[in-house]
């Protein structure tokens, strides 16, 4: 029963981590979008020039890179969470196997011929 409670606790913590990770990723996306809008508005107010165009291009590339990094981080977080759940399941199975072996050994001690 203790192993089940521990597994339940691990799964609950994992779920909370998933919600926090996705929330953080979404917040990052909103920050990138907000920065892009701000840069666009600043650039629109400065007029046309090669340096303004270069800055706009650099900002766009930087925002695209930031979005890729956020997506990569979210993907890796999901992979880690999956591995954590699989490890918790495996640990529960190993615990059950160890208990069965121990009980069999204890019962065998009482057998005499």
From Swiss-Prot:
Keywords: Fimbrium, Secreted, Virulence. GO terms for cellular component: extracellular space; pilus. Disulfide bonds: none annotated. Its main location: secreted. It is found in: Secreted; Fimbrium. InterPro entries: T3SS_pilus_HrpA (IPR018581). Pfam families: HrpA_pilin. Induction: Expression enhanced by contact with host cell wall. Also regulated by HrpRS and HrpL. The keyword Secreted applies. HrpA might be cleaved/degraded in 3 forms but it is not known if the observed processing has any biological significance. Changing residue 95 to S: Affects the secretion function. Belongs to the HrpA type 1 family. Major structural protein of the Hrp pilus, which is a component of the type III secretion system (T3SS, Hrp secretion system) required for effector protein delivery, parasitism, and pathogenicity. Required for secretion of virulence proteins such as HrpW and AvrPto. The Hrp pilus functions as a conduit for protein delivery into the host cell. Also, affects the expression of T3SS-associated genes. Required for full expression of genes that encode regulatory, secretion, and effector proteins of the T3SS. Analysis of mutants revealed that the C-terminus is important for pilus assembly and secretion and / or regulation function of HprA. This is Hrp pili protein HrpA. It comes from Pseudomonas syringae pv. tomato (strain ATCC BAA-871 / DC3000). The gene is hrpA.
């Amino acid at each position: 029963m203790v192993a089940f409670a521990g597994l339940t606790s691990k799964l609950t913590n994992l779920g909370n981590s998933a919600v926090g990770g996705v929330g953080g990723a979404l917040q990052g996306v909103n920050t990138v979008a907000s920065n892009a809008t701000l840069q666009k508005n600043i650039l629109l107010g400065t007029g046309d020039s090669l340096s303004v165009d270069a800055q706009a291009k650099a900002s766009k590339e930087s925002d695209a890179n930031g979005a890729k990094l956020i997506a990569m981080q979210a993907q890796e977080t999901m992979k880690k969470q999956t591995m954590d759940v699989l490890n918790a399941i495996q640990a529960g199975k190993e615990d059950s196997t160890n208990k069965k072996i121990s009980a069999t050994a204890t019962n065998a001690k009482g057998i005499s011929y």
